[in-house]
Amino acid sequence: ALSDPNHRFVPFFGSSEWSRMDAMHPSVLAEAYNRGYTPYLLGQRGAASLTQYFGIQQIIPQMTKKQAVYVISPQWFVKKGANAAAFQSFFSNDQMVSFLRRQRGTSYDQYAAKRFLELYPESSLSQMMEKVAKGQELSKADRGQLKLRQKVLEKEDNFYSQFAVSSRNYDDKIAKKAVSLPKTFSYETLSNRADQLAAKATDNNPFRVSNNFFNTRLKGNYKALKGSQTK
């Protein structure tokens, strides 16, 4: 999609916020105000900075001298770093192959490889990652194996790209909300509109969190959570 000459997609890197398709979602705003691009959403719940870093390795050629938006989530900044289980669930062999083929042994490459091994030491190409982490060059045999894997992965991508994607989600979750926004773009007007929507959606609890979240996750047991994060 990022290489499409007939449509301008801008990658938006983030995590769980992309799944909340409210009226102020960047996809809705782009549709409502004809911004000349379509946000290409990258990331979901549990995705963190290291996940995004390896994901970017796959699209470096398409991103060169192009724009991108990177939304940083506060939950990424935790003492222990990224969650290993979450990282492994989002990581793909294609990302690893792309990284190993593009890396040049820089300090950035070495650090990324070390962090990868901390979170996914049993991966299929961990031996090559260990070489990068130590600043060693990959052998001719290593590069030949990576080239072969890349060809296999490209064939898989070509196969799955044949299947059409329904536009129903776009119509239901984006187009309908875009129509509800003011016709003229204004930060002040949209800010007031966001305040109104937020007040309505968080009016059944003292914490001002989503009514649905409170009803399904907190209402029955929130009193028992008192002091649970003080230690």
Model feature map: region roles:
Residues 18-108:
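Membrane-embedded segments
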Residues 14-15, 70-75, 212-219:
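Short loop/turn segments at strand-loop or loop-helix junctions that form parts
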Residues 99-231:
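Secreted/periplasmic serine-hydrolase-like ester/acetyl group-modifying domain
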Residues 7-23:
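Catalytic nucleophile-elbow at a beta strand-turn-alpha helix junction centered on a G-D-S/GDSL motif
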Residues 1-5:
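N-terminal hydrophobic targeting segments that direct proteins to the cell envelope
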